[in-house]
Amino acid sequence: VYPSSRSSAAFRRDIVEHHHARKKDAPSGTAKLLAKVVMKGCPRKTEWTLQGPGDLKEHQLSVSSIRAGHTYSSHILGVDAPAETLELHHASRSPMAYADGALRVSAWIHGRKGVFTMDQFSEETLDPLFKEVKP
């Protein structure tokens, strides 16, 4: 039997994003996309909100936006429980990260015919990085 802190309801899920002070939209498109993905994987979360964690209803996912300083882009997906925290954090230092990604996709698509999705690109280029390596 797991302690109550191990039950799914005891884990709080949230998204925190931080961008430079000049960024106008809040939350960013990336934060909205992350919220959509989290809600798909956690059906009891049916909407995201900018309300703080203290004001959340059970069906809401907290999204926090910070616009300050010179941080180009930072997104944290957090899962928090009374005795532990898990965070997945992505930060980009400049727009070069996105330019590099666009160039990689361009090289991948060069010479192909048809319409492609980022899922197809990821399946061919990123998924192999996570395959089990046998000793």
Where do the protein language model's features map onto the residues?
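Rossmann-fold NAD(P)-binding glycine/threonine-rich loop
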Residues: V1-S7
